[in-house]
Amino acid sequence: MALDEAIACSVRQGGSPATLRFFGWLKPSVSLGAFQKISDIDTRWCADHNVPIVRRPTGGRGILHNDELTYSFSARDDGLFSTGLLDAYRKISSAFALGMRKI
């Protein structure tokens, strides 16, 4: 998650282009949403079962990750997505399709 924050910061500051990152998890892990309370998670169970808990820079609820492909997407909003929501979805979907072909 720290890498996603670093990428987003670099994109925001103009040091990197829009970036789509695909990644997996080495072992089962829980990711908490940016504003979610840690008390929402059974931390004792996670510790007893060696399940790490990390915090995402994005919102939402806790997610148990295991044997999956995860992605993050960072882009500035200064023109790339200025033509409307539907066009933004098309551009992001095209990036996903290209990324999946390269995997």
Task: Tell me what each language-model feature is.
Residues 68-103:
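Contiguous, small/hydrophobic- and glycine-enriched helical/loop subdomains that border
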Residues 40-80:
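A glycine-rich, hydrophobic loop/mini-helix early in the fold
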Residues 1-48, 52-56:
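Active-site loop/lid in soluble adenylation, ligation, and acyl-transfer enzymes
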Residues 14-15, 63, 81, 88:
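Alpha-helical protein-protein interaction elements
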